[in-house]
Amino acid sequence: MNRLFKKTLSLMLVIVMTVSLGVSAAAADQTGAAQAEGPLGIVSAMSVELNALVEATKISKTEEIAGNTFYEGVLNGVDVVLVKAGIGKVLAASCAETLIDTYHVGGIVFTGIAGGVGDDVNVMDMVIATELVQHDYGTETNSGFEWNGKAGSNQETGMIPVDESLSKIAYDSAC
């Protein structure tokens, strides 16, 4: 990835959440994750998070769908569709659905400034998920976390696996 893009991303705390959408590891490499399956969808919660990506992308088309602006273009040689979802998982899910149904993306990356991600994470740190959990499907008690939902792939822990090829690309671009 080019220096401008790396520098831009290093200016903010970035949480990268990858969602497995059937991108084959063979199709994903440093030059084009998800290209065999479709463009890469990139979702941000806030304008400040999306603006740096829009500026670094050669935009070919802008489209308004359900009150959201979708930017199609090429970012560092990768076909992408960028969108600001707004804050919250319902808005993110709505944009993810549009990316899948309308743009036929091969994968989705969520990037943004996160609040309350832990004491060991500082501003300008990049955090790349290896697995995810829906935070409100359990309760933290004095005895530990008590899982009470069925949101994740692993019914015992609620953890949701991420696409390893997308995580590797995020990691490699950050280093």
Regions found by a protein language model. Name each.
Residues 12-20:
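Bacterial N-terminal signal peptides
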Residues 19-36:
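Sec-dependent signal peptide cleavage junction
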Residues 118-175:
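Mid-sequence, gly/pro-rich, charge-dense loop/helix-turn segments that line enzyme active sites
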Residues 32-97, 103:
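N-terminal short beta-loop-beta anion/metal-coordinating cradle
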